[in-house]
């Protein structure tokens, strides 16, 4: 799994869906991500283990513009070279469950927005919905109903929460989401995985 935030680059690996096998690599970066990305990746996973990977997942943003672009290119390249399926999730979708749990949002069909204030004007915001297939479902499932996009203002009548990146917890959730997609055969060819650019890189 490959993930990035505004200032960190993260890798995660899980063997046979065993949570105890989870391995993580988290590194803060300034302007040096491009120079060290491949070296850090090669240190994290050996060529032998790379060939054993049967599924890749990558976060596509919104996050640092260059980081999102670079990690998606890396994930697409690996998927193509070792011929394994790939899926992707927005950074907000990855943190949505954690935010819902923290704020006691459990009601089925309940919706909320996650937003990030831009340096200049406006926000990036995505919409999420609690989704239980069964009334007694103990596992909190959240659907992304609107991909993160640029908006001028937040809806005053909607429930909103500011985006809050947590490298390790979000890596764990990315692994969990990826496993659910694998079990549901919800996978894509590498060509369909693209970075999410709600705004231009200058904002």
Q: What is each residue range found by the language model?
A:
Residues 1-21, 29-30, 87-203:
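Oxyanion-binding and handling regions
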Residues 21-24, 51:
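Recognition helices and adjacent regulatory flanks at domain boundaries
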Residues 26-43:
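N-terminal phosphate-binding loop and adjacent alpha-helix
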Residues 40-55:
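Phosphate/pyrophosphate-binding loops at sites that engage ATP/ADP/AMP, CoA/4′-phosphopantetheine
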Residues 42-43, 76, 80, 100-101, ...:
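Short glycine/serine- and small hydrophobic-enriched flexible loop segments
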Residues 51-60, 158-165:
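Short glycine-rich phosphate-binding loop at a beta-alpha junction
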Residues 55-91:
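DPxDG-like acidic metal-binding loop motif
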């Amino acid at each position: 799994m490959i993930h990035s935030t505004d200032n960190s680059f993260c890798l995660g690996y899980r063997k046979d869906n065993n949570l105890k096998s989870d391995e993580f690599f988290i590194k803060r970066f300034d302007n040096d991500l491009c120079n060290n990305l491949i070296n850090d990746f090669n240190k994290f996973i050996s060529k032998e283990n790379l060939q054993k990977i049967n599924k890749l997942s990558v976060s596509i943003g919104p996050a640092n513009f260059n980081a999102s672009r670079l990690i998606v290119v890396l994930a697409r390249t690996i998927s193509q070279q070792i011929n394994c399926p790939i899926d992707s999730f927005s950074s907000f979708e990855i943190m949505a469950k954690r935010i819902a749990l923290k704020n006691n949002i459990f009601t089925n069909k309940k919706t909320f927005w996650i937003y990030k204030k831009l340096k200049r004007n406006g926000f990036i915001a995505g919409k999420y919905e609690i989704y239980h297939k069964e009334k007694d479902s103990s596992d909190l499932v959240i659907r992304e109903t609107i991909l993160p996009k640029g908006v001028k203002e937040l809806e005053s009548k909607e429930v909103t929460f500011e985006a809050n990146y947590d490298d390790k917890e979000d890596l764990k959730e990315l692994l969990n989401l990826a496993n659910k997609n694998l079990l549901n055969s919800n996978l894509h060819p590498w060509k369909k995985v693209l970075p999410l650019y709600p705004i231009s890189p200058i904002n």
